Amino acid sequence: YEKKKTKQQDDTHKDKIFNYGYQGKYNWTYDTTSNYQLKFDETQLKYYLDYQGPQRSSVSYERSELNPTTANYSSQVFNFRGTEESIQAAQGDYAFVNGDRPQSINSLFSSTGRQFNGYVITETTQLRFASSFSADFKNHAIMVGVEYDQRNLSGYTVNPIGLWERMRNLTNIHLAEFDTANPIIIAGTSGSLEQRYYRYLYDASKQNQIDKSLREALGLSVDNQSLINTDAFSPDDLKLSMFSAADLLQTGQVGSALVDYYGFDYLGNRDKNSTNLDKFLNDKDDKGNNTLHVGAYKPIYVAGYIQDKFDFKDLRFNVGVRIDRFDANQKVLKDPYLFQEAYTAGEKSEGKPGNIQDDYVVYVDNFRSSTPEVIGYRHYDEKTNTNTWYNSEGKEVSDPKALLGADGKLSPWIKDADFADKNPFSVNAFKDYKPQINVMPRVAFSFPISDIASFTAHYDVLTQRPTDGIMRFDPKDYYFINNTSSNPFLTNSNLKPEKTIDYEVGYQQVLNQKKNAALKLTAFYRELRNQITTQTLSNAYPKTYYTYVNRDFGTVKGLSAEFDLR
């Protein structure tokens, strides 16, 4: 049994993640009463003053000594300027605001004061049992062995410097439009014009958890319409729990996901449970936010082997077989082109052409329609990782664009359209990983041709498990796939071991009477199967993406010569 835990962090700030990238307080206020514009009311035939929204005052800077080198940049700017018109203007004058750090020099060298941006915890446990037995029986040397290996891999990562910009981007965005239908009329007096003041339209659906938490920290109600200045908070005022998991994981935001985790929750607390997709989609915290728990990666490897070395007349044999069983112990997509449940031709057989098999996926013009029209079918070959497309008449089509639906996309006939509109994937679109059993025979023999020459040959099969990083199942990737503007890259939890089949023959001969010189010639042929490569899964639903697949096949042929002189 072995347990290993590592932690990578800044040597000064350590786990105080809001200290990373903090430069100080940037203070400003909002004038919410005087920003009006003269307008004419065509209905009432009179002029009035129309409210145009709050105006922000100039920005002042209150230095912090947590990161003194980068704070020097900002101090120099504000000592010269006094104030700046905005945060963006300060950045334009090369001041660093919270969440900034100096850029690298030509992507080669770190600039003075460039802050380390990372807080990483990894935890790995391994339970391994191995046993072997050997015995000589007459002219046989027999060896038998078994092996069991179960690992538990967990990891947690925060990119803390980006937290400040993420707060800036996620606050106040629910207060974007004025409630012009319900103006507050301030009647004009003594010849002054009527003023029309507007409150914001409060859009609760767009209010992020960090916005709610900051308002609570300021003693404000959640629906208060004050505009928050996130750069006026100090690190001591903030906790990571003020964010929701979605706040930190939103890949549509600048800087992408700021946390990553498996075997931990998004706050860095150890979570020993396995990934449960139903809980991932539905479990919520006490604030009503999805917790998005991801369990540890727990692959299981079992192997057994037997080997026999023996002589038969002049032949010397080494014969054995090894059987490996690899279980990734995680969920995989039933069909890598579908994140939702879709009807097959067997389930919607009316009008099905005779050559269309029952397991082919049905495609329609609009799966949200009560009477969708079938426009084609798709057959996925798991062995070759390829699709074959057919039109509604059962004729094979080379370009699936011919099957585009009413929305300009290839639309599988989704079983539950309402669920698909609200959830990025369905639990029922996944299945358990099928354990891979590999039988690896090994045969080698040699025999003397004469006192000075011999011949050798062997046949060998080897397999190699996929590395953890390219096949660990992470439901967060599927959950946020629609937040990305480009086609994302997802790991493939359904990868199989790579296989090498090796054939080799050799000839060796002593070249002189002293027997201190020898020549060895070897010829070999290798087949490389199930090689892992990248592939674009075009027209997947809900989005095209890139991933790893077992697809490549290769052969290696060679001839070697070796001269040995002693």
Where are these regions (language model features)?
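Phosphate/oxyanion-binding active-site loops and adjacent basic polyanion-contact surfaces
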Residues: 121-125, 297, 556-560
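Structural signature of Gram-negative outer-membrane beta-barrels, strongest in the C-terminal barrel
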Residues: 124-126, 143-158, 164-171, 175-280, ...
